[in-house]
Amino acid sequence: MAPPHKNHNFRPENVLKRAEDLIAVGQKEAALDTLYELIISKRIRYLQVQDLEPIASLLIELAVELRKGKLAKDALHQYKKNIQLSENGLESVQTIVRKFIDLAEKKLDAAQTKADIKIDEEENAAAAAAATSSAGAGGAGGDAGGAGAGGDDDLETAQTPESILLSAVSNTDSADRTERELVTPWLRFLWEAFRAVLDILRNNSKLEITYSAIVNQAFKFCLNFNRKAEFRRLCELLRTHMQSVTTQTTTKTSGHNAIDLSDAETVQRYLDQRFAQLNIAVKLELWQESFRSVDDVHSLITASKKAPKPNMMANYYENLARIFAVSDNTLYHAAAWNKFFNLYSQSPLATDEELKRYASVLVLSTLSIPQRVVQDVDEHKSKNSKLSSLLNLTHVPTREGLIKSILSRSILKYVDEPIQQLFELLEGGDFHPLSIKQEISQLFQIIESDKEFKKYIPTLTEVILIRIFQQVSQVYDAVKLDFLISLGIFPDLEYSLSELQVEDLIVNAVKDDLVSLTIDHESGVVSFKSNPFDEIDQEFANAGTTTTNTITTTTTIGTSRLQISPAELVRTQISKLAATLSESIYLIDPNYEARQQQAKQQALQRCIKDMVNEQQRIADRSKILKDRKVAAEKRKREEEERQARLRQEKLAMEQKLEQERLIAEQERKKLEKLEKERELIKENEKRKIAEEINAKGIIKIDLNNLKELDTTKLQLMQIEQLNKDKKELETKLQATAKKADHLERAYRRYELNLLEADLEIQLDLEKKDYEFLKQSKINKAKKDHDNAIELKKRLQRILPDYSKFKSEIDAKNEVKLKQLQKEAQIKFEKAKQERIESVKKHRIEELKIRKERERKAAAEEAARQAKAAEMAKLKEELRIQKEKDEALARKRAELEAAAAAAAAPSSSPPPKKTMTFAERMRLKREGKLP
């Protein structure tokens, strides 16, 4: 572990160098701890950002490499907190967090590549094994597709022991297992990195560009790896951030670098985020999250002062249409396509093919709106108003309104021919229930060929069958059940209802009050209501059993009637009678109109007379409402301020607790580090002693099992083993010595007789050897002497020539030798004289230096003696002066005592005065005191 920093080692360059040295020796965790301790220190607030940024960058690299996400998060929070007030502090924070995300993404890509390579190798090995065993086993197929990294497992849910055991013993695909082992940890790390970085960058106007970029990267991460659970959490996190921004704006409690939602660029940036969120939610098929995203987009659009771009709104309406399609809300699905087509048709980039396709979808979605009962329930009203506001509509859309919009804007000219024929067939007035079946089947066969149009056939079938049943009920009083069901079955279609499904549709139509009939299954007859008073009686019966919250139902049957039913005649009889009587009065009484005008004038005068009072009442009421509104707004504002204050206090408390936790964490880490270092030192000492013991070969100690042993115990073990070995060795030596002694005695006793015989043999051999060596030496000496005499005779012949040649050479070299000797003598004398001069000069210099030193020493001694004499003289003067002062003080005291005695005589003797030390010493010198 890295030792704690000292004050002299606090400089950033020293810390960075130490971390690099630790990395170089392979201690990356120690280097990470060293950098982390510097980053979380408060002293770095006074350092330059350019000095701290390399340290933070290296810390992030190590944290990503070692997968220390929590440490990186704490370090980034502290780094931002410490340098955010610096000149370029926030720019450095953006650089570091971007690097953090980029490194995490690179690690994830590397893990994915590694997993792909491993999966390919396993598949190749499995294919080879299958090929070798196919002759015997015939091969057994299986699914090769693993879940991969895009599984539905939750990255924030820790693995339980049961899940680990289950994954180990299960027969899951090896690709899935490889992905889970290699890719999932880095997926989890990258997700935690996104969360940490977004928390660091949130709600700061200078960081919002980087914040938006990281949000887009997080969206891409969720889309690329199909992370649905993480996408939901990401959306909730963004909503929380947005809520805090709006709360700060409304309560006016924004702090330094707060987000300004009145800025057009800021709002546009947030809109881009929400539109991206909506698109990803639709692609991931998270429809509830898509609807929440739509709500977020609509809230931002409403709050924005600047209208969003048309292409963004077109995308917004298109996604809304997809969401409504999933929720089976056909009415708002068609309304969304209507709004989308209005914008798309005005785009200069729109092509004829796209216009044709979108117009066909709009017409099909409009025709697919079923004819159901619209209930005026409060909850439905609020829901419809909410959906209408999302579509920027002022009222709830209707099927008739959408059809009128299609006709008024001539959208049918863009529509495909089969869909245009279907529209004319259903809305053009040529709807014949008994003959339309064949035409519908032909058109549906064409529509089914298109995958996007095909999904509207079920709802179109329901709409068409309901209209058929309604018009049959207007013509017939009773029909066979089989006949009615046969009208609802379209053969030769991919989507065709069965008899049971058609009957179920009829029952639901009766339940929704779209048609009135009864079914007699025993006789197989369907009877339509023919008594004009049946429905009226039923309405009165329902009115008698309902509560005050009566549900008024209206049949919205937008179809042409073949004839008026008896029930309709009864319902409209009174209204027709009233209209007829009114027309008769005009004809019978000519003054009726004049009386009506007079009554109107009188009523108008009364209204004018009461207008002033009514205006005053209205003014008073508006004032009361205004006061109430002001009071309510004040209460709301006070409550919001109180809530904001509580949130600020809570945030401050959390920050304080977090700071205390960080301090405690630092202390704990320091203590742990010290404890680990102590343990490491002890462990090293134990290991060193154990290695020494093992090297000596005294005992054998397992170096991997030293936890329960300490140095004292190891030394005791060594001493005990040495004592034991010593005792064993002494015992063995005694036994060996005793055995050797007995054996040696036996050997000597046995060989005594043999040695005497061997001695005689040895003497004979040695004598023979001596004679042989002696004769050999004599022969060799004679031979050498003869050779030497022969050599002398040969050399004697050349001796005169040698002497003559030597004399000549000596004569030639004698002159040269004398010259060289003379030159050498001259050089010697010269060097000798120079040496003498050098020695003289050196000795003279030494003499001068010695005399100078003696002179200085004599002067210093004289000065010292003079100073000592002066000090002695001064001391003597001080002593004399002190004695004079003492004598004077003594005389003064005697005079004062005498004066006091004279002034106050007393019978008692005067007290004896205590002498000072100086007086006693003076009297002793004078001999007056012993």
From Swiss-Prot:
<dbReference type="GO" id="GO:0003743">
    <property type="term" value="F:translation initiation factor activity"/>
</dbReference>
<comment type="subunit">
    <text>Component of the eukaryotic translation initiation factor 3 (eIF-3) complex.</text>
</comment>
<feature type="coiled-coil region">
    <location>
        <begin position="620"/>
        <end position="902"/>
    </location>
</feature>
<feature type="region of interest" description="Disordered">
    <location>
        <begin position="130"/>
        <end position="154"/>
    </location>
</feature>
<keyword id="KW-0396">Initiation factor</keyword>
<dbReference type="GO" id="GO:0010494">
    <property type="term" value="C:cytoplasmic stress granule"/>
</dbReference>
<keyword id="KW-0694">RNA-binding</keyword>
<keyword id="KW-0963">Cytoplasm</keyword>
<dbReference type="Pfam" id="PF22591">
    <property type="entry name" value="eIF3a_PCI_TPR-like"/>
</dbReference>
<protein>
    <recommendedName>
        <fullName>Eukaryotic translation initiation factor 3 subunit A</fullName>
    </recommendedName>
</protein>
<dbReference type="InterPro" id="IPR000717">
    <property type="entry name" value="PCI_dom"/>
</dbReference>
<feature type="domain" description="PCI">
    <location>
        <begin position="355"/>
        <end position="533"/>
    </location>
</feature>
<comment type="function">
    <text>RNA-binding component of the eukaryotic translation initiation factor 3 (eIF-3) complex, which is involved in protein synthesis of a specialized repertoire of mRNAs and, together with other initiation factors, stimulates binding of mRNA and methionyl-tRNAi to the 40S ribosome. The eIF-3 complex specifically targets and initiates translation of a subset of mRNAs involved in cell proliferation.</text>
</comment>
<dbReference type="GO" id="GO:0071541">
    <property type="term" value="C:eukaryotic translation initiation factor 3 complex, eIF3m"/>
</dbReference>
<comment type="similarity">
    <text>Belongs to the eIF-3 subunit A family.</text>
</comment>
<dbReference type="GO" id="GO:0001732">
    <property type="term" value="P:formation of cytoplasmic translation initiation complex"/>
</dbReference>
<feature type="coiled-coil region">
    <location>
        <begin position="72"/>
        <end position="125"/>
    </location>
</feature>
<dbReference type="GO" id="GO:0002188">
    <property type="term" value="P:translation reinitiation"/>
</dbReference>
<dbReference type="GO" id="GO:0016282">
    <property type="term" value="C:eukaryotic 43S preinitiation complex"/>
</dbReference>
<feature type="compositionally biased region" description="Gly residues">
    <location>
        <begin position="136"/>
        <end position="150"/>
    </location>
</feature>
<dbReference type="GO" id="GO:0043614">
    <property type="term" value="C:multi-eIF complex"/>
</dbReference>
<dbReference type="Pfam" id="PF01399">
    <property type="entry name" value="PCI"/>
</dbReference>
<dbReference type="InterPro" id="IPR027512">
    <property type="entry name" value="EIF3A"/>
</dbReference>
<keyword id="KW-0648">Protein biosynthesis</keyword>
<dbReference type="GO" id="GO:0071540">
    <property type="term" value="C:eukaryotic translation initiation factor 3 complex, eIF3e"/>
</dbReference>
<dbReference type="GO" id="GO:0003729">
    <property type="term" value="F:mRNA binding"/>
</dbReference>
<dbReference type="GO" id="GO:0033290">
    <property type="term" value="C:eukaryotic 48S preinitiation complex"/>
</dbReference>
<keyword id="KW-0175">Coiled coil</keyword>
<dbReference type="InterPro" id="IPR054711">
    <property type="entry name" value="eIF3a_PCI_TPR-like"/>
</dbReference>
